[in-house]
């Protein structure tokens, strides 16, 4: 073989060898690419799991915030109701002396018809907002509802009893606005 033939053969052999190497490399690269895709899928699954956990945490946070806001609204509504009752009580306390004066006039004399109509309307208006009077002669004495101004010993009673009402007591719903001022009969003894 001549040198040139030998050189050509070597070059062909090298080209074939290079071609085989490229082919193998491409084949490895292709199979590596498949391997890389499955490796990419694993982080994607982990990422999805992380996103799901984060989403669950956000849902929990949202539920807590909603509950906190609901509790805030309920507390605010209750506070507003307490404030309304307090304001209503203050207004009623200002009007009570007028009702007391009318009650005294009725007790000791008669009201003219126009004044009687005004008193009736005023009492009706107070009842509409929930104001009720209490304290009648013969009622058992209750220190939570009655303020004893005088005590009269009496053999006729077994327990402390309201003998006379000086000023009626008033309740707004369940709340005592003013205790009734009374004279109490107490058992002798």
UniProtKB/Swiss-Prot annotation:
Give one Pfam hit by family name: GrpE
Which PROSITE patterns is this protein grouped with? GRPE
Kindly state which keywords UniProt assigns to this record, in alphabetical order. Chaperone, Cytoplasm, Stress response
SUPFAM superfamilies, alphabetized: Coiled-coil domain of nucleotide exchange factor GrpE, Head domain of nucleotide exchange factor GrpE
Q: One Gene Ontology cellular component annotation?
A: cytoplasm
One example GO MF annotation:
adenyl-nucleotide exchange factor activity
Report biased composition (Basic and acidic residues) as residue ranges.
1-38
- Region entry Disordered, spans: 1-54
GO BP, sorted A to Z: protein folding
Location within or outside the cell: Cytoplasm
- What is this protein's function? Participates actively in the response to hyperosmotic and heat shock by preventing the aggregation of stress-denatured proteins, in association with DnaK and GrpE. It is the nucleotide exchange factor for DnaK and may function as a thermosensor. Unfolded proteins bind initially to DnaJ; upon interaction with the DnaJ-bound protein, DnaK hydrolyzes its bound ATP, resulting in the formation of a stable complex. GrpE releases ADP from DnaK; ATP binding to DnaK triggers the release of the substrate protein, thus completing the reaction cycle.
How is the quaternary structure described?
Homodimer.
Return the similarity comment: Belongs to the GrpE family.
According to UniProt, the name of this protein is: Protein GrpE
